[in-house]
Amino acid sequence: MPFGNTHNKYKLNYKSEEEYPDLSKHNNHMAKVLTPDLYKKLRDKETPSGFTLDDVIQTGVDNPGHPFIMTVGCVAGDEESYTVFKDLFDPIIQDRHGGFKPTDKHKTDLNHENLKGGDDLDPHYVLSSRVRTGRSIKGYTLPPHCSRGERRAVEKLSVEALNSLTGEFKGKYYPLKSMTEQEQQQLIDDHFLFDKPVSPLLLASGMARDWPDARGIWHNDNKSFLVWVNEEDHLRVISMEKGGNMKEVFRRFCVGLQKIEEIFKKAGHPFMWNEHLGYVLTCPSNLGTGLRGGVHVKLAHLSKHPKFEEILTRLRLQKRGTGGVDTAAVGSVFDISNADRLGSSEVEQVQLVVDGVKLMVEMEKKLEKGQSIDDMIPAQK
């Protein structure tokens, strides 16, 4: 799929209604918000780095969405996108993040000691635990918009920072372009590496340009702390391990992430953050904490229960298939994670996962014995 809004200035030769995209068959947040009037109002605006409204919406125009899955349908190209195009982004953010208003403030809490429990999820059911987030480096444009030189500068800065980590975080960087096909596939299968850029969302937004130039993965020596460089975000920071010790996974996540943040600050490149949106990331769905705390959990009986979906909704959790977004569950193993990102803290979001998964495992055990779980259905969180 070709990408390029290089003729944005040229588009202004045509009337706004002649350029307005056909969104009649679309089911995404952008299409819900973008009226012809709003398009007209914003189409000649651009951010200081030159990102325009057409750049913001292209991925949502090319990917109408799914009848049952509401995609976001837009991206930011730089930190200023959320301000310059706030008339589009604010209603999308409010819709996507449970009514989070333009006046609301986000809260951050990376003190792992505030998490209660989490070290006792039953490993017979909980096969692995992971926490991830994204970070954007101030002073650079985001992946949908950055140039080759800029992307390489982000990689250089990131590798220098990561290579200075010590102790349990000591590790090594592996650039994508020097990996063999086999090495890449092995890392993807082990859930360590991002997939090749075949996702239409990635392609249509321009994030896959120049692939695999300046992309790579850094991980510590025992592969429990990983950083992806220059995929959908400048950095994706991941803490993971087999089994159900979410407490330890979250501790390593918080400690490692704060170490990295400190190094970037000292280098004069703090992460993009503001008190309204929290951590600023490429996709509006990740604003706030950018955090997804997830477990792979085996729920052979509960997943067939008529109230499974309702239970997840009430616990503020979401399910994905075993291989992540848009994949099926293999052997009744689901990827269960927090549904929220914005308006609540990292600790609160992981707490919901820990408490919710614990309850679902108890339910699964009851159903195995042929007992009813009706008295265990939780109230809406």
Swiss-Prot record:
Domain Phosphagen kinase N-terminal: 11-98
Domain Phosphagen kinase C-terminal stretches: 125-367
Reactions performed catalytically: creatine + ATP = N-phosphocreatine + ADP + H(+)
Entries under Gene3D superfamilies matching the protein: ATP:guanido phosphotransferase, N-terminal domain (1.10.135.10), Glutamine synthetase/guanido kinase, catalytic domain (3.30.590.10)
Residues reported to bind ATP: S128, S129, R130, V131, R132, H191, R236, R292, R320, G321, T322, G323, G324, V325
Enzyme class (EC, first level): transferase
Phosphothreonine: residues carrying this PTM: T166, T180, T313, T322
Described purpose of this protein according to its UniProt entry: Reversibly catalyzes the transfer of phosphate between ATP and various phosphogens (e.g. creatine phosphate). Creatine kinase isoenzymes play a central role in energy transduction in tissues with large, fluctuating energy demands, such as skeletal muscle, heart, brain and spermatozoa.
Quaternary structure and partners: Dimer of identical or non-identical chains, which can be either B (brain type) or M (muscle type). With MM being the major form in skeletal muscle and myocardium, MB existing in myocardium, and BB existing in many tissues, especially brain.
Assigned protein family: Belongs to the ATP:guanido phosphotransferase family.
Name listed for the protein in its UniProt record: Creatine kinase M-type
Source organism: Oryctolagus cuniculus
